[in-house]
Regions:
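Auxiliary Fe-S-binding modules of radical SAM enzymes
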Residues: 29-154
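Glycine-centered flexibility motif
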Residues: 6-8, 12, 39, 142
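Conserved non-cysteine loop/helix-boundary elements of the Radical SAM core domain that shape
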Residues: 1-4, 10-32, 47-58
Length: 154
């Protein structure tokens, strides 16, 4: 009917193991989604997992690279969570194999209403007014932002 599928997981979420990560990777291979969103787990203080530690940026980058190898054409975002845990997390994600950025185009005045986790990245490079800064940061690592429709190439 004309839609595409996606799946994903949080890296370093409570009770996750190497085995569950292997199962997640196997599922991605079998399910064959058009997009897979993974990012490090970031606790939110008002949830049952609020006292757990955040996931690892390095492990997330490793898993992004594995997914890129397993599914060469998949749409693979460099998540805001990576940028929240590391000042150059988005760029590191792209260098590890991500090929999608999803900037938050909400006005800065409205961002507090959408707090998925504590200390969520919310900078000028995330707003529509500062898209040029995002383009420049991606250009600085040898890539460019494309704003055309982003269907997967099969």
């Amino acid at each position: 009917i004309g839609f595409q599928t996606g799946c994903g997981f949080m890296v370093g979420s409570p009770f996750q193991t190497s085995f569950t990560l292997a199962e997640d990777l196997a599922f991605i291979g079998e399910f064959d989604p058009e997009m897979c969103g993974i990012g490090p787990f970031i606790p939110q203080k008002d949830t049952p997992f609020g006292k757990f530690s955040a996931g690892s940026v390095q492990q997330t980058l490793f898993l992004l690279s594995l997914i890129r190898l397993i599914k060469p054409n998949i749409l693979l975002p460099a998540t805001t969570a990576l940028g929240t845990l590391s000042p150059n997390g988005r760029e590191l994600g792209i260098k590890a194999g991500a090929n999608v950025v999803m900037p938050n185009l909400s006005p800065l005045s409205e961002r507090r209403k959408y707090a998925l986790y504590d200390n969520k990245l919310s900078t000028g490079t995330e707003s529509a007014q500062s898209l040029a800064l995002l383009k420049e940061s991606v250009k600085n690592i040898g890539y460019k932002i494309v704003t055309a429709r982003g269907d997967i190439k099969k």
